[in-house]
C-alpha cells in the first residue's frame, strides 16, 4: 500500500494520444454529442469564396461561432446571411483537426424575427431613396398598346396562367416569358439577370425586345418575398430602359422593387390589366368615333349644300349677264367693214405720197457720191508704214537671237568645265587612283580581306589591280611571315595629282 501511495510518477495509467488521435476523438465526440442543432445569433463577417462556398460568423455579445454553407446548399437557403442580420441557423457542429478549431456546417438559415428583416429593409429603402431611385421624375410612361410583353416569373405557377388569361381576355399580345426562381437565394440574381437580359435584346431581332416588362410573383411571407427586396433587383429595375410593372405578392405586400418600378400593380392580374386596354372597349370607342365623324361630315355636307344653293340663287341669270356684251358686239360688227375700207384707203394714199418722192436720178447721184468717198479713203491707205515697222521688228528679233545663242553657248561651256573638274576630283578621290600607284584590293567573294588571318581562312581570293582582277587559291600556312614593308610612295610632281586612300 505504501508503495502505491509513494509512487513517484502518478498518472501513468492515463491513456496517451497523439495530436491527430485526440483531434479525431474530439471531432467524433463533438459530432456524436450534439448532432443537428439550431443556433441563434447576429451575422458578422460574410465571405463567399471563389469556389462558391459561403463562410460567415454567428455571434452574440460574448462569443463567435464560425459557420460554413457549402456551394450546393446555398440555393436551398430561404435567406442569404447578411452582416447585421439576426438569424437562426440549423446544421451540425464539426471540428477541423488540422487547426484544432470547430465550426458549424449550416444548411438552413431563418430570420430570428420579422423585426430584423424589417429593420434591414428600412435601411436599404433609406439608402436607395437617398440615391434618388424612387423619384417620380424617373418613372417612365407605359406604352398604350405594347406589341411584345416580357414576363419575369416562375413558369410553373398560377401567376403566369393568370397573366396570360387576362391578356387574352383584354387584348391578346405576344408574350415572352423569362423563367426565374421567385423564392430562395437564387431568386434575386436570376430576376436581375432577366431584367438586364430583356434590355439587352435588339429591337426587331430574331428574339425581339419587349416593349413592356412585368415582374410578377404570388403572395407569401416576408421571407418568401425577400428576393425582391434585394439591392441587386432594385438597381436592375432602376437601370431598365424598358418600362416595368411590378406585381409581387398581394396588395398589402410591398417590396423594394415596387418603389423603383415604373408602376406597382397590387396583383399579377392587375398588372396585365394595366399593360393593355380592353380590345372590345377600343372597338366600341372606334365605332363611336366613326359614327361621330360620319354625322359631322353629313352635317358639314348639308351646310355646304345649303350655302351653295343660297349663293346660286343670288347670282344673276346668264341671259342677263350676256345681254350687254351681245349688244356691244353687234355694234362693233356693224362698224368693222367700213373701218377696214377706210384703213386700206389711207394706206394707199400714204404709199402714193412716198413713191412720188423717190426719183431714179437722185438715187444714182447718191450712189456715185458714196463711191467717190470710198476711192478717196482707199488712196490714202499705203503699205509703206507697215513694211517699215516689220523691218524694225525683224532686226530686233535677229539681235535677240544672236544674244540668246551667245549666252547659251557660254553657259554650256561653263557647265562642261565644271563637269570636267568634278570628274577629275572624282578620279582623284577614287580608290582606282590608289590602285594605279601600285596598291591592290584583296577580296573573299564580296567581302574585303584586311589581314593574313582572313586570307588563310578564305576559300578563294580575288586580287584587284589597277588594270584588272585575277583569282588565287588560298593555301594554309603554318609559319607566319612578316609582310615586307611597303615602299614609301613617291611625292607627286604637282599637288593636284595626289590621291587619297580610304
Swiss-Prot record:
Enzyme nomenclature, EC number: 3.1.11.6
Keywords of the record: Cytoplasm, Exonuclease, Hydrolase, Nuclease
GO molecular function, one term: nucleic acid binding
EC top class, as a word: hydrolase
GO biological process: DNA catabolic process
Location in or out of the cell: Cytoplasm
A Pfam family this chain is assigned to: Exonuc_VII_L
Biased composition (Low complexity): 474-495
Major subcellular location class: cytoplasm
Catalytic activity: Exonucleolytic cleavage in either 5'- to 3'- or 3'- to 5'-direction to yield nucleoside 5'-phosphates
Keyword Hydrolase: yes
Region (Disordered), start-end ranges: 474-502
Sequence similarity: Belongs to the XseA family.
Self-association and partners: Heterooligomer composed of large and small subunits.
Stated role: Bidirectionally degrades single-stranded DNA into large acid-insoluble oligonucleotides, which are then degraded further into small acid-soluble oligonucleotides.
Protein name, per record: Exodeoxyribonuclease 7 large subunit
Originating species: Ruegeria sp. (strain TM1040)
